[in-house]
């Protein structure tokens, strides 16, 4: 399998962030918590984002210290390994309030890389 470059991982992150935003659009917490399919889809997207973030090289992570790379990766680990202890309120708040803001930062990384 050919090695993927950093931009491929960044585009994966953006794609899954778009999915999260679209899945939770026009939805409140009560609807989210009662919609098993959306809950599971958002969790899966966060897992993939967390895995892709781990592929971002250290020099890029250091160049953008305000982006919560470590937290995104850590959330992935918690979601993968705590099957019965998922904090759905944290998942919701991350999906609804943090992902749209963080997405802008990942878009900036791609823009910066493409301008090189």
UniProtKB/Swiss-Prot annotation:
Keyword Nucleotide-binding: yes
GO cellular component: toxin-antitoxin complex
Keyword Nuclease: yes
GO molecular function: nucleotide binding; RNA nuclease activity
Post-translational modification: Modified by cognate antitoxin MJ0126; probably at least 2 successive AMPylation events occur on Tyr-83.
Protein family according to the UniProt entry: Belongs to the HepT RNase toxin family.
Record function comment: Probable toxic component of a putative type VII toxin-antitoxin (TA) system, probably an RNase. Probably neutralized by cognate antitoxin MJ0126. Neutralization may be due to AMPylation by MJ0126.
Listed name of the protein: Putative RNase MJ0125
Organism: Methanocaldococcus jannaschii (strain ATCC 43067 / DSM 2661 / JAL-1 / JCM 10045 / NBRC 100440) (Methanococcus jannaschii)
């Amino acid at each position: 399998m050919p090695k993927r470059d950093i931009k491929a991982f960044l585009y994966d992150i953006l794609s899954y962030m778009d999915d999260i935003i679209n899945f939770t659009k026009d939805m409140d917490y009560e609807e989210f918590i009662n919609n098993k399919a959306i809950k599971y889809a958002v969790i899966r997207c966060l897992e993939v984002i967390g895995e892709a973030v781990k592929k971002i090289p250290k020099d890029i992570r250091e160049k953008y210290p305000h982006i919560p790379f470590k937290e995104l990766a850590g959330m992935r680990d918690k979601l993968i390994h705590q099957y019965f202890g998922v904090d759905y309120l944290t998942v919701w708040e991350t999906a609804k309030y943090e992902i749209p803001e963080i997405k802008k930062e990942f878009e900036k990384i791609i823009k910066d890389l493409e301008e090189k």
